Amino acid sequence: MKQYLELMQKVLDEGTQKNDRTGTGTLSIFGHQMRFNLQEGFPLVTTKRCHLRSIIHELLWFLQGDTNIAYLHENNVTIWDEWADENGDLGPVYGKQWRAWPTPDGRHIDQIATVLSQLKNDPDSRRIIVSAWNVGELDKMALAPCHAFFQFYVADGKLSCQLYQRSCDVFLGLPFNIASYALLVHMMAQQCDLDVGDFVWTGGDTHLYSNHMEQTHLQLSREPRALPKLVIKRKPDSLFDYRFDDFEIEGYDPHPGIKAPVAI
C-alpha cells in the first residue's frame, strides 16, 4: 500500500488549505488516481490496523439495500452512528440507490442486479455502471454519497472496477473505501466466474483534515508490510446471500491502530 502513503505525502506537500462543511478545515488536492492489482494481494492498509469487521458488514448492509443502522448495531459496527436520526434512519443513502433507485413513473431500478446481468450477458458493455448520486434525493440523505459512481470492465477473463469518489477523507475513510470496493470486485468476480483484475480509485476533493495531521505523520513513519490475501470460503447462489463468515483475511499483520476524530 505504498501508493496510499504517497498520496498522504502528496496532500501534505501540495495541498491547499480549505474550509469545509464540517468546520474542521482541510489540506486538499483535486484529482488523484491509484491502481491496485487485486491479483497481488488484498489492498488493506498495513501501516495501521483497519477494522475489517466494519468494512465487511457495511458492504453486506449496502447490498441488502438497507439504510437503517439496526443491522450494523447488531454486529457491533458504529461507523454510521453520527449521521443517523433517533430511529436509526439515514434516508435514501447508498443501499437505497444501489438496489432501488426510484424512477419518475414509480418503478425502482436494482442497479446491482442489473450490473450482474450485464457482466454475465454483455461483459463488453461500456455501460456497466452503478451511481449513488441521485440529485433528486440528495436533500433527503443524512450524508451525500462520497463514493458516488463506479464502473466495471471485463478483459481477458478478469473483472476490474473503477470508482469515482467526489470527496475523500484520506486518513480515516480511504482505507475503508479501497478495501470495500476490492471486496465487492472479488464477490462480483466469483458470481460471474471471472478472475479479479484491477481496482482503480479516482478521487475528486482528496483531503486530510486539520485534526488528523499528527496521526498522518505517525502513519508515514511506518514501513508498509506484505498485503494479506482474501479467501472466500463458499460461493453462495446469489451476490445477496453472502454472510460475514464467508470471508477470511490471511496474513494480515498490520502496525497498531491509530485513533482519530471523525469530522461530522
Curated annotation (Swiss-Prot):
Record's subcellular location: Cytoplasm
Molecular function in Gene Ontology: thymidylate synthase activity
InterPro entries: Thymidate_synth/dCMP_Mease, Thymidate_synth/dCMP_Mease_dom, Thymidate_synth/dCMP_Mease_sf, Thymidylate_synthase, Thymidylate_synthase_AS
Keywords of the record: Cytoplasm, Methyltransferase, Nucleotide biosynthesis, Transferase
Organism, as annotated: Salmonella typhimurium (strain LT2 / SGSC1412 / ATCC 700720)
Biological-process GO terms, alphabetical: dTMP biosynthetic process; dTTP biosynthetic process; methylation
Residues annotated for dUMP binding in this entry: R21, R126, R127, R166, S167, C168, D169, N177, H207, L208, Y209
Subunit-level organization: Homodimer.
GO CC terms of this entry: cytosol
Protein name (record): Thymidylate synthase
Function: Catalyzes the reductive methylation of 2'-deoxyuridine-5'-monophosphate (dUMP) to 2'-deoxythymidine-5'-monophosphate (dTMP) while utilizing 5,10-methylenetetrahydrofolate (mTHF) as the methyl donor and reductant in the reaction, yielding dihydrofolate (DHF) as a by-product. This enzymatic reaction provides an intracellular de novo source of dTMP, an essential precursor for DNA biosynthesis.
Pfam family, one: Thymidylat_synt
Database matches in SUPFAM superfamilies: Thymidylate synthase/dCMP hydroxymethylase
